[in-house]
């Protein structure tokens, strides 16, 4: 996933790039999560990075739950766009 390719998709409705938006923050966390998981294929015992990954996953989950409460349509669109599994715990 390339940063430049996704920014226009996120800011398409607002006609401006807003790095503080919930969608952009979720994109950044998702990008970091995917990079870290590919890192773990080579470095299985990198426990410090695994802890960082768990922290990032928690932050992304909190943002996703916030977005699902505020705007369910944007939440569903974002989940489908980034191929994120929907949380079962509410």
From Swiss-Prot:
Keywords: Chloroplast, Plastid, Ribonucleoprotein, Ribosomal protein
One GO cellular component term: ribonucleoprotein complex
GO biological process per UniProt: translation
Pfam (any one): Ribosomal_S15
Intracellular or extracellular location(s): Plastid, Chloroplast
CDD domains: S15_NS1_EPRS_RNA-bind
InterPro entries assigned: Ribosomal_uS15, Ribosomal_uS15_bac-type, uS15_NS1_RNA-bd_sf
GO MF terms held by the record: structural constituent of ribosome
Highest rank taxon of the organism: Eukaryota
Quaternary structure, from the entry: Part of the 30S ribosomal subunit.
Family: Belongs to the universal ribosomal protein uS15 family.
NCBIfam families, per database record: S15_bact
PANTHER family given in the database record: RIBOSOMAL PROTEIN S15, BACTERIAL AND ORGANELLAR, SMALL RIBOSOMAL SUBUNIT PROTEIN US15M
Name assigned to this protein: Small ribosomal subunit protein uS15c
């Amino acid at each position: 996933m390339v940063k430049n390719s996704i920014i226009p998709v996120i800011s398409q409705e607002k006609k401006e790039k807003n790095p503080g938006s919930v969608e952009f923050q979720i994109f950044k966390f998702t990008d970091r999560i995917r990079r870290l998981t590919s890192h773990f294929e080579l470095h299985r015992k990198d426990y410090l990075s695994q802890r960082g990954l768990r922290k990032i996953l928690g932050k992304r989950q909190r943002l996703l739950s916030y977005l699902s409460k505020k705007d369910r349509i944007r939440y569903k669109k974002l989940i489908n766009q980034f191929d994120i599994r929907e949380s079962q715990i509410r």
